């Protein structure tokens, strides 16, 4: 097989591959379907809600751990500038 025949075969095979790809366009094109963008937006809102819930959980865990550490300490004076849950503030803080 001479070099011209070899390059001709490669050219035909590549054209067939391109033709196959053109026959089946990508179904994952987000710019074509606005419902996909709505789904992405909803996912972002869900992630923000999860982040907010996680932050609240961390604050509550922090206040519970401080409460457990200082459960026997009657003279404990909490820092009123810290973020504690309402139950903790009522029980342990004098922030009036």
Curated annotation (Swiss-Prot):
UniProt keyword annotations, A-Z? Disulfide bond, Secreted, Signal, Toxin
Q: Is Ligase among the key words of this record?
A: no
Q: Where is the signal peptide?
A: 1-23
Describe, from its UniProt entry, the tissues in which this protein is expressed. Answer: Expressed by the venom gland.
GO MF, one example: toxin activity
Q: What processing steps or modifications follow its translation?
A: Contains 2 disulfide bonds.
Q: Which GO terms describe its cellular component?
A: extracellular region
At the top level of its lineage, which domain of life is listed? Eukaryota
Predominant place of localization: secreted
Places the protein is found: Secreted
Family membership: Belongs to the scoloptoxin-06 family.
Name this protein carries in UniProt: U-scoloptoxin(06)-Sm1a
Q: Which organism is it from?
A: Scolopendra morsitans (Tanzanian blue ringleg centipede)
């Amino acid at each position: 097989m001479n070099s011209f025949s070899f390059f001709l075969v490669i050219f035909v095979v590549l054209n067939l591959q391109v033709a196959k790809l053109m026959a089946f366009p990508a179904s994952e094109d987000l710019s074509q379907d606005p419902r996909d963008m709505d789904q992405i937006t909803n996912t972002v809102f869900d992630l923000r809600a999860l982040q907010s819930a996680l932050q609240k959980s961390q604050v509550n865990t922090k206040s519970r751990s401080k409460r457990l550490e200082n459960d026997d300490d009657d003279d404990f004076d909490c820092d009123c500038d810290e973020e504690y849950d309402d139950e903790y503030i009522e029980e342990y803080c004098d922030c009036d």
